[in-house]
């Protein structure tokens, strides 16, 4: 029950409910076998909390569950900073510094994660990059859609200047030159990234 989960693993009532929803009646058993499930999706509890539960169960600091969880956590943390992947060597070094375990042990855990498709690897210029599967799928989907847009013929913005003048007159203000350029590109380019700035 949620009460047992709360008491055993020292987590708040809301998280206990989420644990029970995620793992069902076998939650206690699943977390006892692998406390690091708590810091993965969808719960994302603090890694150190999972560490303390693992210590309660006398799990070693270099156990497979901890090594694999450290790799996943490192990738998720970097995804939060805008990185969809990391070079293999950088991932191993970062995870090694995080849990104070040698990169060689993490390399074996990484190979297992790739084998079980928990993580994905792609080569770019001879360098292996490691991805979380959902981020690789998203990146490939975006690349595919951009390729489709790039193949389309460009639009011609007929009478754009005249239409802009009419718009300015009816709305009672004039667009700045950069704003006019942004509108022109939005009307003629197949794909446009408009970054923030004054007037956007």
Describe the role of every protein-language-model region:
Residues 1-200:
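Conserved ATP-binding/catalytic motifs of P-loop helicase motor domains
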């Amino acid at each position: 029950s949620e009460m047992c989960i709360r008491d055993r693993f020292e987590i708040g009532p809301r998280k206990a409910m989420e644990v029970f929803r995620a793992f069902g009646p076998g939650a206690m058993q699943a977390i006892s076998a692998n406390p690091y499930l708590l810091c993965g999706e969808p719960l994302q509890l603090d890694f150190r909390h999972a560490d303390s539960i693992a210590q309660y169960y006398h799990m070693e600091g270099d156990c497979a569950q901890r090594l694999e969880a450290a790799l996943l956590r490192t990738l998720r943390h970097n995804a939060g900073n805008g990185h969809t992947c990391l070079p293999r060597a950088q991932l191993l070094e970062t995870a090694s510094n995080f849990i104070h375990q040698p990169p060689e042990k993490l390399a074996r855990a990484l190979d297992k994660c790739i084998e079980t498709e928990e993580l994905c690897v792609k080569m770019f210029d001879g360098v292996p990059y490691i991805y979380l599967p959902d981020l690789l799928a998203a990146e490939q989907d975006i690349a595919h859609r951009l390729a489709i847009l790039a193949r389309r013929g460009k639009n011609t913005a007929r009478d754009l200047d005249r239409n802009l003048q009419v718009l300015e007159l009816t709305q009672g203000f004039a667009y700045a030159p950069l704003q006019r350029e942004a509108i022109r590109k939005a009307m003629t380019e197949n794909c446009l990234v408009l970054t923030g700035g004054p007037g956007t």
